[in-house]
Regions:
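Conserved core segment of the aminotransferase class I/II
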Residues: 3-22, 83, 109, 202-205, ...
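Conserved core of the PLP fold type I
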Residues: 92-241, 252-274, 446
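Walker B catalytic acidic pair
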Residues: 248-249
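PLP-dependent enzyme catalytic core of the Aspartate aminotransferase-like
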Residues: 104, 112, 118, 122-123, ...
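Generic structural signal for small/hydrophobic residues in well-ordered secondary structure
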Residues: 45, 64, 110, 128, ...
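Short beta-strand
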Residues: 61-63, 282, 366-372, 426-428
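N-terminal small-domain helix-loop-helix segment of the aminotransferase-like
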Residues: 4, 8-133, 140, 460
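Conserved glycine-rich beta-strand-loop-beta hairpin in the small C-terminal domain of fold type I
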Residues: 344-361, 367-383, 389-399, 433
Length: 461
């Protein structure tokens, strides 16, 4: 026992449990039949190549599945990362807590060198918030929506072919994901008409659309939205009462040289006052530098109250990591970050691969999208309902053997385990007649992957 209490001291009722929050702020009981959030198959599909490698140890395999430049393009050499980390860390107390939203010099570097924000924006480096990768920042954005809405069950609107994790991160935070209508003819792109239809749908279900996500270049389709398209979509969303707008630019550096990055300074200055208070831009090192495991991304947040709230979320959840910040300072600390060697090692070969993908798939007669970024989105309808070559069977989702391709997932299994080329089946993106093909590779490797893919699907009967 401790002798800690003074004779005249009254600590109140210490023998009863007590809620941390006042009764009016307690989370209400709300029963729901919540589905399971399953692990992403994008991290495991490439492992299925092992079956092919075991049977054909002397043949090349091709991984065109996950967009992981840190793997497919070799990544950043460890000795270069070590040097960057040594430059970043202070000489003493090098493992102390960092700033929950990113160290000041890193935020200043991205503010001035990467975006070149001018005084007209009204922004400062305090409006730049770093996190532990894109997923971390998305989680904080979802939490911000719930905090601002003071209720669960509302909607975040995504495209007709969304990145798989958009629909999981929302759900984890008590938000529903609604996919806007979209067709192959418009590349599954967002339109103002699609926003209108989605708002009507939500209203009929007694819900509201609290957030919307625009991604350019897009994952999985590779679609690229022009400057004017982005401005129009952002402003239209605000006009229609959507209060949280997330613009995911994580692939914007990985474009053709003549396309380049968006001028976010110009884009931000062109927005209305209301739009500036509603929009968040995200970018990072995962794709531009192949820094997949560095887990470094940042948001530009014009709403100062949101900055305050996001700081609060960061202090109680996840801080930026030191190695990721060191890499960010190495890149953003130079005058023109997109000319950094780490970036060029990704953008150079990927641009060459992209040009080859367009030329080759067109020559072979495929229907596909291949604008910018890492991916081509390919219509594989002609290869469904086909029979696998004699003597070859694949396992279906129940583990039974079959000799027919009925679904895009069957095609993925056939290509990966029997042909040695890994892709992502479009079911992951709510488009079961498509596959995603990553060309973030050396052009020679990409050429081999296309040949293996084409030879394999044309062998189906």
């Amino acid at each position: 026992m401790y002798d800690l209490i003074f004779n005249d001291q009254n600590l109140g009722d210490t023998g009863s449990p007590k809620y941390f929050d006042l009764s009016e702020h307690l989370v209400p009981i709300s029963a729901m039949d919540k589905r399971e959030v399953k692990p992403s198959g994008m991290f495991t599909i490439k492992l299925e190549l092992g079956e092919f490698m075991q049977e054909y140890p002397d043949r090349n395999v091709y991984d065109a599945s996950q967009g992981d430049g840190g793997f497919s393009l070799g990544g950043i050499p460890p000795e270069e990362l070590t040097e960057a980390l040594l430059r970043y860390l202070p000489q003493s107390r090098s493992t102390q807590y960092g700033n929950p939203i990113g160290r000041e010099d890193v935020r200043e570097a991205v503010f001035h060198n990467y975006y070149g924000f001018d005084t007209l924006t009204g922004l400062t480096p305090d409006n730049v918030i770093f996190g532990d990768g894109g997923r971390d920042l998305l989680q904080k954005w979802y939490q911000l929506i719930v905090s601002n809405a003071n209720r669960c069950g509302d909607i975040v609107l995504v495209s007709a072919a969304p990145w798989g994790s958009y629909a999981q991160g929302t759900y984890i935070n008590g938000i529903n994901t609604l996919m806007a209508p979209g067709t192959p003819e418009n590349g599954f792109k967002f339109t103002t008409e699609a926003i209108d239809v989605s708002l009507e749908f939500a209203l009929a279900d007694n819900r509201r659309i609290s957030g919307i996500v625009f991604t350019s270049p897009d994952n999985p389709t590779g679609n690229y939205s022009s400057y004017d398209e982005l401005i129009n979509l952002i402003e239209y969303s605000v006009e229609k009462g959507i209060t949280h707008i997330f613009v995911d630019l994580i692939y914007q550096v990985v474009t053709d040289p003549e396309v380049g990055c968006y001028d976010v300074n110009k884009l931000y200055n062109a927005l209305s006052k209301e739009a500036k208070q509603s929009v968040v831009f995200m970018d990072g090192l995962t794709k531009s530098a192949g820094g997949s495991n560095l887990r470094n991304a940042h948001m530009v947040v014009g709403n100062d109250h949101w900055v305050h709230l996001l700081k609060g979320l960061a202090t109680h959840t996840v801080f930026p990591n030191a190695l990721g910040e060191a890499a960010a300072l190495e890149i953003y600390g130079q005058e023109n970050p997109i000319d950094h060697p780490w970036v060029k090692r990704v953008t150079g070969p990927t641009a060459k691969s992209r040009a080859f993908v367009r030329e080759r798939f067109q020559k072979l007669g495929y229907k596909f999208i291949c604008d910018q970024g890492y991916y081509a989105f390919i219509n594989i309808w002609p290869y469904l309902r086909k029979v696998i070559p004699k003597g070859i069977t694949i396992a279906d989702s129940q583990g039974s053997q079959k000799n027919r391709i009925d679904t895009a997932e069957d095609l993925k299994t056939y290509l990966t385990t029997k042909c040695g080329v890994a892709i992502i089946h479009g079911t992951v993106f709510n488009q079961p007649h498509f596959i995603r093909f990553s060309y973030a590779n050396d052009p020679v490797y990409t050429a081999g992957a296309i040949k293996r893919l084409h030879d394999s699907v044309t062998a189906l009967e």
